[in-house]
């Protein structure tokens, strides 16, 4: 069954607090957009320059949600009353569940903020590595940061989140420290399991696991199995990029969903913007095979540029063809990034990030489209999200029709497929080029595979530029 996930940063939603995720917001997500899950990014307490206890090594003013300072706390700035922040978090969880939604938060296993309180207290700092150390050290060497850090000193230096060096560069994750994992069980494993179980006990329904390729698969296998023994319905989503390892992360490690950034996302972006042939969409699903239902499809998230930005499609309407394929091609889960459905462009210059086509995760900023949505864009998104929940799309079979087309059908710019659950059937035609009329033929073998008897098998349709057409054929 099709699962829809909505990612948002609570600090940029509504009033910027847990209380801003209120009944009105949840009704919008559930009733207007048909969401099943809400992924709240930036809940667990992270390094920030704001508030009563500002940290010194921070990217931006608000700080990255992925530089965790305390794994057992939430950000005070998200609470109306900072002293009651955990109670306010639990109240938000209850509202989410009462609305028929489930909650995802981030689990960041690879690294922590430099001023983290949960790790390193018992480390032997005289050696570079020891199996029971939480961090990697550079004995005798101070940390040399690429930026000024308000008098912060670290001696000996520790390895940063993505680089083994006492002198990380400006493009490195210098505000974080890499955690030490072994391929065999250590106390770091136990600490991380305790953290995940803590949040599961708070009512969290799933974890989006950050950069899992940087931690041992053996650890994630053990952690997922351990959590699911107590919480069998807990969902784990992996941020992964190596397609060759997809099957391992599903079948051996145990993840429920995987980012398909390196597959369908990259393909659709290249077809939409860089002239790649639409044939690549077929090649991508063929390479995935039976893994398709485990892929998390998306066109935006906090790491990627906005579809409507000058770096991608330049306007939201030019992303409709890609949206139709990403959302409707199969019954894989689909993720929407807050403001995407309203036409957000992400073209403001924002502190640490600058003008990069993204909504900054490092600074206090605005999402203008949430305040003044493009109503025509919101209507189109609401409509196609509704169709994605129809049984033919939510759990039906897919038949790629591109191979059997000819004439004015352009396999480099057009992509057509049919979906059916045996009772209802639909034809979807996506056009990545200019407005064009073309004919789509449905062969007998497609009808047999889909279990339908269509009244017509030849359709001449006009599909607008960078758009799609959806037709019911049974």
Question: Residues of each region from the PLM?
Answer:
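N-terminal structural segment of carbohydrate-active enzymes
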Residues: 1-102, 110-112, 117-121, 128, ...
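Active-site-proximal helices and loops of the catalytic beta/alpha 8
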Residues: 194-197, 205-295, 325, 343-383, ...
